[in-house]
Amino acid sequence: MTRPGRVSRARRKRLDKQRVVHAGVAVADRAGIDSLSMRTLADDLGVAPMALYKHVADKEELLDGMLDVVLGEIDLPAPGSDWKSAVRKRILSARQALLRHPWASRVIETRTRPTPVALAYIDAMIGMLRNGGFSPDLTHHALHALGSRLYGFTQDVFDDSGRQDAGAEPSATAREMAATYPHIAEMMTVIYHDAASVVGPGCDDQFEFELALDLLLDGLDKRRRRPTSDRSPAPGGSARPESAKPRA
C-alpha cells in the first residue's frame, strides 16, 4: 500500500503551471472568482499553498494565466476568410468563451497590462481589419466600436500617458513590440502621431461612443430597409430558412 506521504509527494511532482492555471479556471467556473485564493486553489489541488508559488509568482500572474486559457478557447477564422466573416466569427467565439467563464469579463477589467497571448490576439484582430482594407485609423475606431473588452483587453493597451514625443527615438520596448506585434505597433503609431487621425492623439471616449452609436444606427437603418422576411437571422447567424420564416 502506498503511504499518504508518497502520494502527496507524487502529486506535487506532477504540478506545473498549466495544471495550476487550469485548476484556477475550474475553481472560478464552479464557485465564482471571489472564492478563488491561493489557499483555496492549493486545497483543490491537494498541495500546500507554497507549492503554487513555484509556478505562479502571485495571484495576479495566476489570473493572467487564467485569462490566457479563455483566450485560447476562441476559434481562429478559416484561412482565406474575408475580413467581415473572420471578425464576426472571432467575436461570436469570444462571446461564447466569456459565457462559459462568466468571471472572465470582470477579471479583464482589472488587468493593467495585457499578456503576450492577449497581445497576439489583439494583433491578429487588427490584422484581419487591415487585410480587409481598413486604414490604421479606422481600425482603431472599429476596435472601439466593436467593443474592446470583448476581445480580452482594456484600453490600457492604448495608454498614452507615458508615450514619447513624436521625434524621440523608439525605446527598446517599442522596437520589440513592432517586431512581435506589427499590427498593434502600426496602429499605435498612427493614433498617437499621425495628424490624419480623426480624433488626434490617443483616444477620445466621447468620439468613440458617438461613432459606435452612429455605426449601430446606420446598421439598424440598413437592416430596416431589407424585406421583412430577411430581417431576422437564424440562430447560427444566417438568414432563416424559408420553412422557418413566418407565413403571411
Model feature map: region roles:
Residues M1-A31, S35-T40, D44-V47, V56-L63:
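Basic, helix-initiating cap at the start of DNA-binding domains
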Residues D75-A120, P136-L146:
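Hydrophobic alpha-helical connector segments
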